[in-house]
């Protein structure tokens, strides 16, 4: 809809403060970068990058200047005479981006541009795109199913579920203050652990533990509340001081480890719980551990999943 390729059923699309809802695609000054590179196999890198400008009847001197400028920015200068078949996946994606950059558009729309790359290349290209957007200063709408890409690249992130907008906020706001359990579960890796807990005047009952009753949960006394605990929201404690768990595996990530443990029946959940632990801690598989939530606990309505 932003590019004008799909009809807008309601609302307005403003680009640079101008209402472009009914404008033709070529009038919107939006450049697209697709999941598939969509490069012309019979053209060189330079010809692919220049194609849109040639169609727009831009003069040759300007085309040469812009292609050279974009190629230098994307480290493609030495590859301008090659054809797509002679390029790596990362190089092809750079060419696709260069084709959009030379237009000097008002808005970039990038539709999962890194999904066809291997894991290592995705990480490096993620940084390159973020740096490129910073240097160009062009508004960029970036579509992705990868929450790591969204969190590391976005200044503001819009989370959607089945076409319905759930929350628009900064990555930090999404992580710390999700509006519902869907957003809480989508943002963060390993995923947040969710538990259905009864609430009494004494507090919130998480298995054998009694957690303090926060003000936003006071109305739930006599009912249940859904609590969410992220991996860093757990503390390892001494025997008998927390929930008894059975170590399933330890995920080693260098500077830190993630303990994945099976909960006991008192938690009424079959899913594993992920706990962030320091790199020197590595309990063996099957070894019992005791964990307790710290102050980083989120509370949700158990009926509709909205944050309390």
Report the location of each language-model feature.
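Helix-to-loop junction immediately C-terminal to a conserved catalytic motif
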Residues: 3
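ABC transporter nucleotide-binding domain
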Residues: 171-201
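ABC ATPase nucleotide-binding domains
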Residues: 22-182
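Non-catalytic connector elements of ABC transporters
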Residues: 190-194, 199-308
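A position-specific signal in ABC ATPase nucleotide-binding domains
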Residues: 6-7, 14, 54
């Amino acid at each position: 809809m932003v590019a004008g390729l799909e009809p807008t059923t309601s609302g307005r699309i403003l680009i640079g403060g101008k209402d472009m809802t009914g404008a033709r695609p070529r009038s919107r000054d939006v450049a697209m970068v697709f999941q598939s590179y969509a490069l012309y196999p019979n053209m060189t890198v330079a010809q692919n990058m220049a194609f849109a400008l040639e169609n727009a009847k831009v003069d040759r001197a300007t085309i040469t200047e812009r292609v050279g400028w974009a190629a230098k920015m994307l480290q493609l200068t030495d590859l301008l005479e090659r054809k797509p078949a002679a390029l790596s996946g990362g190089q092809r994606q750079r060419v696709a981006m260069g084709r959009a950059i030379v237009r000097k558009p008002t808005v970039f729309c990038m539709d999962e541009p890194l999904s066809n790359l291997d894991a290592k290349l995705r990480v490096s290209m993620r940084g390159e795109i973020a740096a490129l957007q910073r240097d160009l200063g062009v508004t960029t709408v970036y579509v992705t199913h990868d929450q790591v890409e969204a969190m590391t690249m976005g200044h503001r992130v819009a989370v959607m579920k089945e076409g319905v907008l759930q929350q628009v906020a900064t990555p930090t706001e999404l992580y710390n203050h999700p509006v519902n359990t869907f957003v809480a579960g989508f943002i963060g890796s390993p995923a947040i652990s969710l538990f259905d807990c009864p609430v009494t005047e004494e507090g919130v009952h998480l298995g054998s533990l009694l957690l303090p009753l926060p003000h936003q949960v006071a109305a739930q006394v006599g009912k249940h509340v859904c609590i969410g605990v992220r991996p860093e929201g757990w503390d390892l404690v001494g025997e008998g001081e927390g929930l008894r768990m059975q170590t399933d595996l330890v995920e080693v990530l260098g500077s830190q480890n993630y303990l994945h443990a099976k909960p006991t029946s008192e938690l009424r959940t079959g899913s594993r719980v992920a706990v962030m632990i320091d790199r020197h801690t590595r309990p063996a598989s099957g070894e019992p551990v005791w964990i307790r939530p710290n102050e980083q606990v989120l509370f949700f309505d158990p009926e509709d999943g909205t944050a309390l």
